[in-house]
């Protein structure tokens, strides 16, 4: 029987992404129970990821994996950063706010960053990794795939937005995939 690994999130889209990215790992992925509420009040992506994984693992008595990620824009001194998901009330308004704040700004350099943390059933941190993806913020959205800031984030090497990429292409560049790639060998050992 496969060991259970909780994904510390209530987002059904996230478990689908994790299923694909963690396909080499012999585990059964489940979303955290709806009854668990974790307040993300850390001062870094790493603190938030560790807190989510630790709380979910202790409350479920199972391993839990969590990530915290966001968009950091050079001209905005790293904003929205750890507040990326709370920068406005929905994706459309978040994009609108970014574009308004960057209006007339020539420096459009940005990067997505993700911290991924795994905690054991006692809430102890076992694995932690960071991944990043460099790009630029466009003047207007482009593409129909993805979510969040994907339509305005143009990846540096392909010159495509994440919203113009299919999931397989996005996975090869994504900050979350890069962070998970760093810990997959250890995850395989834990969930043998």
Predicted regions located by residue number:
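Anionic-ligand binding patches
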Residues: 2-6, 13-192
């Amino acid at each position: 029987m496969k060991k259970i690994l909780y994904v510390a999130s209530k987002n059904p889209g996230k478990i689908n992404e994790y299923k694909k990215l963690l396909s080499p790992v012999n585990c059964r992925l489940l979303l955290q129970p709806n009854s668990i509420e974790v307040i993300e009040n850390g001062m870094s992506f790493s603190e938030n990821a560790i807190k989510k994984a630790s709380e979910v693992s202790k409350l479920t008595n199972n391993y839990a994996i969590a990530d915290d990620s966001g968009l950091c824009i050079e001209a905005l001194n790293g904003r929205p950063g750890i507040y990326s998901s709370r920068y406005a009330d929905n994706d459309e308004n978040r994009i609108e706010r970014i574009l308004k704040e960057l209006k007339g700004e020539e420096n459009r350099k940005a990067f997505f960053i993700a911290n991924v943390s795994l905690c054991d059933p006692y809430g102890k941190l076992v694995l932690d990794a960071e991944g990043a993806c460099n790009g630029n913020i466009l003047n207007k959205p482009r593409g129909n795939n993805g979510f969040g800031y994907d339509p305005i984030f143009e990846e540096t090497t392909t010159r495509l937005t994440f919203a113009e990429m299919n999931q397989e292409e996005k996975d090869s560049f994504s900050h979350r995939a890069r962070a998970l790639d760093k810990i997959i060998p250890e995850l395989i050992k834990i969930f043998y």
